[in-house]
Amino acid sequence: MMQMRTHTCNQLRASDAGKSVKIVGWMENVREVGGNLAFVVLRDFYGTTQVVVEDEADLKIIKGLNKESTISVEGTVRERASKNPKQATGDIEVVPTKIEVLGRCRYNSLPFEINRSREADETARLKYRYLDLRNPAVKQNIILRCQVVAALRAAMTEHGFLEITTPILTASSPEGARDYLVPARKHPGKFYALPQAPQQFKQLLMTSGFDRYFQIAPCFRDEDARGDRSPGEFYQLDMEMAFATQDDIFAVLEDVLPPIFAKFGTYNVASTAPFRRIPYNTAMEAYGSDKPDLRIDLTCKNVSALFENSEFEALRGQTVKMVDITDCALTRKQIEKLLTDCEVQSGSKAYWFKVDENGEIAGGIGKFVSGVKDELAKVLTLKPNTLVVVAAGEYATKSVGVLIKTFGAACENHFDKERYEFCWIVDFPMYEIGDESGELEFCHNPFSMPNGGMEVLLKAERGEIDPLDIYANQYDLVCNGVELSSGAVRNHDPEIMIKAFELVRLGEEDVKKKFPAMYNAFCYGAPPHAGIAPGVDRMVMLLAGESSIREIIPFPMNKNAQDIMMGAPSTVEQKQLDELHIAIVGDVEKDD
């Protein structure tokens, strides 16, 4: 059997001159010179090669094809008279002896230029994703994703973890987001759910006697899109360890991740073990965020006490937080523009003042703070050319977090950009008051072990302590201001589990009903265990230097959770609904 090709389009060099070769690919570009000469740029997965068409019959074939048609070229390699140093194969060209059409592009014009597809409208890019992915710059992100996943698998295997797949069809459980439900044809009125995470299965593996588990796990959550979150599905490096503590988990990831980030990242510098550990409350107080970007050296100070009787109503009696930015060269216009950006992100108005060359407070709200300059100087650096940005009010903490990230990124002397800076956020609150319910709810993972175990839960039950003061043995991994993962030491004791759920108004029967397998397994003797699940998509997004997670997913949905290339979601035939015992009630969105 003859080979389809002898070389790829990135392989031939000047040393190959005179060789007979066969290459295949897409016609990226055709440039005709007069009526008897054409230059064709042939592109495959690996690169491009110039083909010089001089034969009349071959010219006729080329002229009858549209760009992006696929062809096979048999011919001879010759050295170019005019070389192109920007191209890997720029020293040579192929003179064909035979051209064969493999697949015609039947359209005279394309939805966008392949090599400029990133400039195209996102809807067009998603609809014609198979064309978008022909762009080497777009394709490179997918290649990077493959390389990172392979490196993660190798590293986890080296650390003694077994890759075990867990079910995709499972039971619905209250894990935070909405489930994707799958009707069970053989069980009318009942549904499977696609797993939001393999949380229960991986804990059950630990109770089954496995010691170290991992998988590149698909997770399905019916939630809205964000820049760093894709709707529908995502993938995570899911891992769990039996007879393990928080420190055991930290040790594995602190060994696995830095080499991968340094090797594959836009920057080649990454934190080394041990990563900095910051308690949740400290992170919120110092950075206004539980996802601090430690490349930025700015922190905030709470100066509320100085403004209890301020003349400025926006500060008077409010929570007031300030960030001092020394040696700041931003102009007034730049400051105002950044403040406007921050207000859009945080939903709260922010303010500023500066210390001029003479050490005097000026600009912005300076006249309202100059009276407490001496007191401010005890907590802020107020040397000449210092800018101070101010957040005030009910949402001051959120607002100041946005100010730190926005102004920090704008001031090069406060932003060590070209590195990957990891940190652990630890000691999260176990409970919170729900925004919608107004009642006590789990803050994050309901399966976390509370710090203090049963004793602290009983104290809360008796009213001796506020449940909001209970902390979980839970942790987040953050890199460059992006949350990569949440994890926890698990609550493996069924009695402690029930007591933890009782505080959020779920009794023993509720726990047994919602988590029957895990509860029963724990009753047969469970090991203390811990785990975490860094998001693969977010990691690759960081490594690629992309701001949108859709850029590193081969076939992403749009912001409205639609796959406009495949036409999903879509209506289905009535016969299918009848088989599943489903009736559509209410208005139905028509297919486009």
Task: Give residue spans per PLM region.
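Class II aminoacyl-tRNA synthetase catalytic cores and aaRS-like
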Residues: M1-D592
